[in-house]
Amino acid sequence: MPLAWIRRDRQCIGPVRPPVFLLYREQARSYNGGRSGPATMPTTAIIVPCRLESTRFPRKLLHAIKGQPLLVWVAERIAAQAPEFPLYFAVDDESLRATVAVRGFSAIMTSPGHASGTDRLAEANRVVRADFVINVQADEPLVTGAQIRELARLVAGAAPMATLATPFRRAADFLNPNQVKVVVRGDGRALLFSRSPLPYVRDRGGAVDDAWVAAHPCYKHLGLYAYRADLLERFASLPPGRYEQIEKLEQLRVLENGYDIMVGLTEDPTIGVDTPEDAKRFEEALDAQG
């Protein structure tokens, strides 16, 4: 299936694809043993894994931005952008649970000992029992409904996992190891994720400028995922991959164990709040919106 773009006006550019309800109907048929007739429609839920402590920005989810904790900005954004999906917060501390619960959001207490957000997600879904799980990061306050719906559409297809990417526009970002790159096959499946510049431009000795980056398929991976429940449950038991351990990118575990990851492309910007400086950038974005 070829790639398609989501514009800021949320119109799809590119080949016409089956509506998401048709994909869900086909999935429902498979859940019903291939039989026609009444079937239990598979469910999709958004789960946000939340960890109180953070190395670069301690207790960042409770950091106040314009008088409101970052986690609340994220919760309200998701609820407003994608109200059609049930929303849960998988938390590891009572302070996080109380922060979302007092505002009417559902919170699930999970073990504080999880090694990754994906493990926390899997524990929470044993309570939620969704067939498809969309993972929005707790520090991504500008996620859009179009992005969430694209993830739901992709994971309802053949691949057990989906994620999003956006084109690089600046060489400095492309060369930054903190901005993860993804190489995408012609059918939309991920070929490789890396912190290194991908592709490496041999004819230029690796030297690139903004114009070159903007004109070539250089994609930044966004930390938004969707999982089929069976893969999510299996993830924790998969052996860590060699490249995962080198790059410190857990999505490589999925590829190294032979599973496909579909990649959707989006032009919507995101701001991951990893540092106090990022929090200031988000506040500036709020000011710009008025």
Indicate residue ranges for each PLM-predicted region.
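Short, low-complexity intrinsically disordered segments enriched in A/P/G/S/L with frequent Arg
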Residues: 7, 14-16, 22, 28-29, ...
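N-terminal glycine-rich phosphate-binding loop and ensuing alpha1 helix
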Residues: 42-91
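Hydrophobic/aromatic residues located in beta-strands of well-ordered beta-sheets
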Residues: 46, 87-89, 162, 190, ...
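Short phosphate-binding loop-to-helix
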Residues: 88, 94-153
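A conserved hydrophobic position in a structured secondary element of the catalytic/binding core
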Residues: 91-92, 143, 227, 274
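Conserved core of the sugar-phosphate nucleotidyltransferase
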Residues: 144-239
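Conserved alpha/beta core of the MobA/IspD/sugar-nucleotide pyrophosphorylase nucleotidyltransferase superfamily
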Residues: 207-290
